[in-house]
């Protein structure tokens, strides 16, 4: 199995978190002929890897069906966490778990797939690439969503 790294909250100098920029992008969903919701994992993977939406969707659907014994044959209602974990780590991605961290605490130097509660998003050099502006949360005092962890791409 893949290695997991734990990363503590890393606020910027002086304790202030710098904001993240946002770019709206559907990851190729519309071009592939899909509409709707619950495809954040597919979008994030496509936006970071450049793979086609259909290819990633087919791979994740197959893996979810296989991992659940056919109980969940489709990813139409979303991709289960163990499925995207196995998919990404199987391709050499490394998961870093974060403790007491919020979205702005993600590293700014590179491409990552961020995992927040009930959502996954692409981060490119400190900019959120997503179908909707997912940078903020009303559920936390800071106004930012908790960062549960992030995937880093395989070393070149």
Please annotate each region the language model reported.
Residues 6-8, 17-18, 105-112, 123-128, ...:
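Solvent-exposed, well-ordered amphipathic alpha-helical segments
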Residues 4-74, 91:
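Active-site nucleophile-adjacent alpha helix/oxyanion-hole segment immediately C-terminal to the catalytic cysteine
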Residues 136-156:
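Glycine-rich, aromatic-bearing surface loops/beta-hairpins
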């Amino acid at each position: 199995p893949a290695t997991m790294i734990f990363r503590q909250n890393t606020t910027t100098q002086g304790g202030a978190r710098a904001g993240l920029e946002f770019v709206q992008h559907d990851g190729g969903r519309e071009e592939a002929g899909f509409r709707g919701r619950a495809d954040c994992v597919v979008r994030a993977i496509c936006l970071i890897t450049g793979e086609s939406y259909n290819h990633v969707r087919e791979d994740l659907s197959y893996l979810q069906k296989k991992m659940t014994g056919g109980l969940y044959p489709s990813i139409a209602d979303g991709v289960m966490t163990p499925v995207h974990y196995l998919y990404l780590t199987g391709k050499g991605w490394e998961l870093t778990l974060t403790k007491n961290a919020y979205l702005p605490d993600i590293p700014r130097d590179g491409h990552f797939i961020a995992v927040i509660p009930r959502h996954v998003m692409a981060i490119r050099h400190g900019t959120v690439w997503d179908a909707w502006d997912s940078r903020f949360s009303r559920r936390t005092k800071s106004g930012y969503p908790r960062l549960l962890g992030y995937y880093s791409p395989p070393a070149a």
